[in-house]
Amino acid sequence: EMTSSLVGSEMCIRDSLQADGNYNWNKQQGQRNFLRLAKERGVNKFLAFLNSPPVYFTQNGLATNTGRGGTLNLKEEHYKNFARFLANVIKGVEKHDGIKFNYLCPFNEPDGHWNWIGPKQEGTPATNREIARAIRLISKEFVNNQIDTQILVNESSDYRCMFDTHMTNWERGYQIQSFFNPDSTATYLGDTPNVPRLMVGHSYWTNTPLNNLHDIRCQLKDTLDKYKVNFWQTETCIMGNDEEIGGGGGYDFTMKTALYVARIIHHDIVYAGARSWQWWRSIGGDYKDGLIREYSDPTFLNGEVKDSKLMWALGNYSRFIRPGAVRKAIIAKDNQGKIIPEGDTDVTGLMCSAYQNTDGKEVFVMINYAAEDKEFTFYQRNGIIKNWKIYRTSDKDGENLLPVGSIKNHEKVVIPARSIITLVTQ
């Protein structure tokens, strides 16, 4: 079993790897049950990540970084064992549970500048060189075991560490350049088997002030494009610096948080070019991180849950924009017909984005951040008249992706104050 000093029972995950090197596949039944339940309900892509190597391999004998700095908590002699462990887990879960992990991210927030010391560690401090060394060994182990799981780098805690440095030194910054510029010979992963030309990162800390929301993502996209690297946003929630909505403390069921998060989604997709967007987390307590608010009894065996407008607002995107969709360009014009620069984004008004799914259906998402109703006329350049069904989420009771009618191209649409609508071709 994994042992980690100071970590409470509700935070501690029991590892299947035992001290004698054998695996006990009866461990982590709760987590594995949820994987199976998800698969039964149609989920067909699974991503695994970890915050620490097994304690038998770590330098301090713990699964936290207590007493250490910003380097990998892994003994020199156990890099290969770590890679072998990951291969065994990927194969073991598929064999015993029928769950194939499509993706593995071995390092979570390796550039984290916040407190890595103590029982609440949720990250894997590591330098770029340590990451590259481990990834190459994991890749080799996967190839030898005919595992086609994709290995992702590197779950950055802050976009600024991906193209620059931010509250850390160069050894844990400039990650895009380090891993995907061939001149970075010590850390280049661009020709490593099982490693896609893809960077993953978290949009924490970069959502305020509003110029950061825009400018940091533009800088990120410029660097990604320079090295021909794709991007996924793989974790975010509300943090202390998100002062516009009161920071992370205290749950919010209303459109205030829902609209704030929708604005982040819009900027991550439109300006950072995110091809996947993921929220932390599905269920939570009195903090702005759960799509659903849980009220557990002291035994954790019973309780109640309540949905939020945040959950439904995420659905304005995820329910209709399906895997494989492509984003389409939007041109906004004023009443005189003049093109508005970046007219698809008014951070205190209307923000819109458009997509085409693999089945040919088109999707248009519009956010109205303003305190008053807005109207616009919607049309397509190709001139094909289509019917669009409208789904709306707002603070009104029952308006949770509620169908509210349909329109045709060239018709005027009114979007109520502080609401989100999704238009889908019929």
Regions found by a protein language model. Name each.
Residues 1-13:
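Single conserved hydrophobic/aromatic residue that forms the stacking wall/gate
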